[in-house]
């Protein structure tokens, strides 16, 4: 199971250098519902900053819809909220805490399947490592 945060999804979407999540047929890709908001906001930010024109934005939004359809998205439920508001032992931003807490929940439900936390965000990687998750991508 591969948990992908917004930075990993965006690297796939924009084909950025520096590697991304290696996708293999049959991979179980998961994330938080939060990833939808973060990634659509990022595409809109690219448009507003003049890096995407209207046609490019429409294509990227369609590609993003297709990419997100490959993910099983977990709800931000009471477990996630309680874990995210708890102490991490390292400095953690709110959205990063939600991603890490969601990954912890999914790892606990994985029924023997190993979870890898994919991110290209150093601070989020540190937060995930502080909670014992296996981190890839940074």
Where are the regions a protein language model picked out?
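Short, well-structured N-terminal submotif of metal-dependent ribonuclease cores
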Residues: 1-37, 46-59
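Active-site neighborhoods of divalent-metal-dependent phosphate/nucleic-acid chemistry enzymes
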Residues: 70-123
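Alpha-helical scaffold domains
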Residues: 25, 67, 73, 79-81, ...
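Helix-adjacent hinge/juxtasegments
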Residues: 50-76
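Alpha-helical elements of the RecA-like P-loop NTPase motor core of helicases
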Residues: 11, 82, 125-129
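Acidic, PIN/NYN-like endoribonuclease modules and their adjacent C-terminal/linker elements
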Residues: 1, 32, 105-138
């Amino acid at each position: 199971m591969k948990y992908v945060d917004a930075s990993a999804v965006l690297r796939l979407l924009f084909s950025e250098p520096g590697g991304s999540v290696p996708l293999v047929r049959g991979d179980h890709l998961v994330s938080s519902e939060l990833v939808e908001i973060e990634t659509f906001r990022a595409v809109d930010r690219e448009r507003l900053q003049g890096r995407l024109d209207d046609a490019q934005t429409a294509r990227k939004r369609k590609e993003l819809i297709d990419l997100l359809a490959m993910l099983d998205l977990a709800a931000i439920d009471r477990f996630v909220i309680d874990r995210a508001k708890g102490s991490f032992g390292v400095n953690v931003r709110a959205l990063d805490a939600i991603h890490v807490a969601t990954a912890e929940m999914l790892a606990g439900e994985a029924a023997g399947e190993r979870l890898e936390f994919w991110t290209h965000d150093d601070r989020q990687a540190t937060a995930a490592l502080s909670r014992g998750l296996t981190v890839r991508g940074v």
